[in-house]
């Protein structure tokens, strides 16, 4: 039985927990929760019968195998360091934190030193296996075009001074590097960092706000010595958090199941 603790108790954490609770094979179980908003952690703990922790230190000190970070990019460094130092592997959902190359290298070296693992799910995009394999050759271009409903980008756009009520047709709201994208859309474009890490090449990112779209669309183009990889995924937004896709949570659930299975499919 894989014993799991969860940091961050929002929509993604709830989806992951409920899926594992309903898993008939019962090879993994969430045993403890922590959130900076203690009420959220206490509520989810009461709903599931798991422990409610009042601090991250309390969570990582428990008898757990794996910590799942579902909080925010700002929570990643502390969560990963404390988890690794307490002999626990970590799944990082807020992978946008790794747009900071220095942070990624720091945590990579710590995990290597301690003999622990940091897992990054594929998230809401397809083709990561092929992109990782292709990165063994020479990559010459990586682009990501993400189109989302306006309401899913609303908070990020308004922070940049854009009135979302004025967007009546599909509008390009960002074009630039993966590093710029994650700084302006930290809750919307984690997939760009996953793609860049998998390809070992900095992705060019375009973000489109579409008032008529009901799904989150991610189009990937990768060119290199292996040829061309093109994928397009249209994901249903998470019901409780339209900034992200339900598939992002499902990718973490599948990763957890893979960790407890004797056979693993895919790269």
Curated annotation (Swiss-Prot):
Sorted UniProt keywords: NAD, NADP, Oxidoreductase, Pyridine nucleotide biosynthesis
Molecular function, one GO term: NADP binding
Pathway participation: Cofactor biosynthesis; NAD(+) biosynthesis; iminoaspartate from L-aspartate (dehydrogenase route): step 1/1
An annotated GO BP: NAD biosynthetic process
SUPFAM superfamilies, per database record: Glyceraldehyde-3-phosphate dehydrogenase-like, C-terminal domain (SSF55347), NAD(P)-binding Rossmann-fold domains (SSF51735)
Catalytic function, reaction form: L-aspartate + NADP(+) + H2O = oxaloacetate + NH4(+) + NADPH + H(+); L-aspartate + NAD(+) + H2O = oxaloacetate + NH4(+) + NADH + H(+)
Active-site residue numbers: 218
Residue positions binding NAD(+): 124, 190
Record EC number: 1.4.1.21
This protein's record includes keyword Oxidoreductase: yes
NCBIfam families given in the database record: NAD_NadX, PRK13304.1
Function per UniProt: Specifically catalyzes the NAD or NADP-dependent dehydrogenation of L-aspartate to iminoaspartate.
Recorded family membership: Belongs to the L-aspartate dehydrogenase family.
Miscellaneous note of the record: The iminoaspartate product is unstable in aqueous solution and can decompose to oxaloacetate and ammonia.
The protein, known as: L-aspartate dehydrogenase
Species in which this protein is naturally found: Methanococcus maripaludis (strain C7 / ATCC BAA-1331)
Gene name per UniProt: nadX
């Amino acid at each position: 039985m894989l014993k799991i603790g969860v940091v961050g108790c929002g929509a993604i954490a709830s989806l992951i927990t409920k899926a594992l609770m309903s898993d008939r094979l019962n090879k993994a179980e969430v045993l403890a929760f922590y959130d900076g908003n203690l009420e959220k952690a206490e509520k989810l703990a009461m709903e599931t019968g798991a422990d409610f922790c009042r601090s991250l230190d309390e969570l990582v000190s428990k008898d757990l195998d794996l910590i799942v970070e579902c909080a925010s990019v700002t929570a990643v460094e502390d969560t990963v360091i404390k988890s690794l130092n307490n002999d626990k592997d970590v799944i990082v959902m807020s992978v946008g934190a790794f747009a900071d190359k220095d942070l990624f290298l720091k945590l990579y070296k710590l995990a290597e030193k301690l003999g622990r693992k940091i897992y990054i799910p594929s998230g809401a995009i397809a083709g990561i296996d092929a992109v990782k394999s292709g990165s063994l050759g020479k990559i010459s271009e990586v682009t990501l075009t993400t189109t989302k409903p306006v309401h899913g980008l609303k908070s990020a756009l308004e922070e940049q001074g854009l009135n979302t009520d004025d967007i009546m047709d599909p509008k390009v709201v960002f074009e630039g590097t993966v590093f710029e994208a994650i700084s302006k859309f930290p809750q919307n474009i984690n997939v760009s960092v996953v793609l860049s890490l998998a390809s070992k090449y900095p992705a060019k990112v375009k973000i489109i706000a579409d008032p008529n779209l009901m799904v989150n669309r991610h189009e990937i183009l990768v060119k290199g010595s292996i040829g061309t990889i093109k994928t397009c995924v249209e994901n249903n937004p998470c019901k409780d958090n339209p900034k992200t896709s339900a598939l992002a949570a499902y990718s973490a659930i599948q990763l957890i199941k893979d960790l407890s299975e004797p056979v693993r499919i895919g790269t």
